[in-house]
């Protein structure tokens, strides 16, 4: 096999690959053995048609696609290794010669990982951020504790108010016609959560159980449905039931119920200590993130658009998984937020671009500084993870290995060591 790499522009180039005729004929043999099993010719059992008869009846060309499916992945992979390039997307393949008894010739247009020209990454300065724990932050944490231990109590009578869980039926109409996706029954909605289109939840306040109301809202101009975007709609709503949070009193009894402490003062002291530990971690994370962002800003990188799109794919998927944990789907989110996937991707694009830039920058710094993740480093990381998840390190290693995760773990450790270098060489100013 012969391969030639020619860079065309920016991060794109063309691999011209030539595969020996003997390999082509061998692939055609494999293709025939596969295809003939599905062919029925009078006078022959299925799968027993002679090769010459098959070719005279159907043509050898009928085997070409199956032979290409056999040849292309292996030839392309070998050519990539020989050329020493790192593709970041599937290639565009153009077969220029495919014929029995002749060499296979094809061209693969490839987008490759970009070159990173590092700027300053040592001695970077960042301004210190205030992460101090105040009485107000302790009180806010205790308030959240109250919220978590609040009891949802059915409201027998009275009007809906902000903070209530309203169970409603609703149906939306535009110009008097019901529109698709605008109807639900017994839907639980926390008033004030901002889940629905602006103005919807506010108009439910004051509604009594069993009452019906017509609510008028205006869809956002950028709403994913052009039939509704920027237009007024009327929702017919019925309030079926209400639940209200019954907040526990912050006293010694509360402390005993929710913790191992006997008094509220002890609980406050412990809460403050935990917040200080948490903010210390947040400060460390803030410093690391700021240094990485500065190093990435100082680097020159011509980002391939496809790398950003792949990152967006992952981010949208992650967002959908977070919604599922909250009992919502992406489809419902699009419906109630007035966005579609394209708009969500646009909203996430800046973060996706930053993530790709920082990843490439850290990889380049790691290479420049010869930073590697050793087996000892990875074993230490496995021990740390074992402590977090309460499982033996050997068991975690087996899990990572079974899921092809060890390479990713090595990369994560290498990245952490690279950021450690940035921190060690940095200056944090007040």
Curated annotation (Swiss-Prot):
It is found in: Cytoplasm. Gene3D superfamilies: 3.10.50.40, Trigger factor ribosome-binding domain, Trigger factor, C-terminal domain. It catalyses: [protein]-peptidylproline (omega=180) = [protein]-peptidylproline (omega=0). Its main location: cytoplasm. Its EC number is 5.2.1.8. It comes from the Bacteria. Keywords: Cell cycle, Cell division, Chaperone, Cytoplasm, Isomerase, Rotamase. Consists of 3 domains; the N-terminus binds the ribosome, the middle domain has PPIase activity, while the C-terminus has intrinsic chaperone activity on its own. This is Trigger factor.
